[in-house]
From Swiss-Prot:
Taxonomic classification: Bacteria, Bacillati, Bacillota, Clostridia, Peptostreptococcales
InterPro entries: UPF0145_dom_sf (IPR035439), UPF0145_YbjQ-like (IPR002765)
Top-level taxon in the UniProt lineage: Bacteria
Protein name: UPF0145 protein Amet_0532
Signal peptide: none
Pfam families documented for this protein: YbjQ_1
Family of this protein: Belongs to the UPF0145 family.
Amino acid sequence: MILVNTDYISKKELETLTIVKGSTIQSKHLGKDILSGFKTLVGGELTAYSDMMNEARAIATKRMVAEAQGVGADAIINIRYASSAVMGGAAEIMVYGTAVKFV
C-alpha cells in the first residue's frame, strides 16, 4: 500500500475509490501523567505524551490502511492527520485520505 500526502502519484493514472479514515483515542497511565505534570514546571519534552501520540498515529494509520484494503485500493493519497484533546491526559488522532486504484 502506497501512502502519500500529495494528491497524485508520479507516473500513475489513478481511479478514485472513496474516502478512508482511521482514528483512536489514547490516554496515559496516571503515574506517567503526574510525572509529566512535574516536567512542565522545568520545561522540556514530555516524552510520555510524545510516545503516546506516535503510538496513536500508528494505530490510526493502520486502521485507515485496513479500510482501504477492504475496498481494493492500491494507494491512499492526500493523507491528513488531525488531533484533539478529548479530556485531560487523553487525545484523539484521526487520519484520512482518498483510496485510489491504479488504472
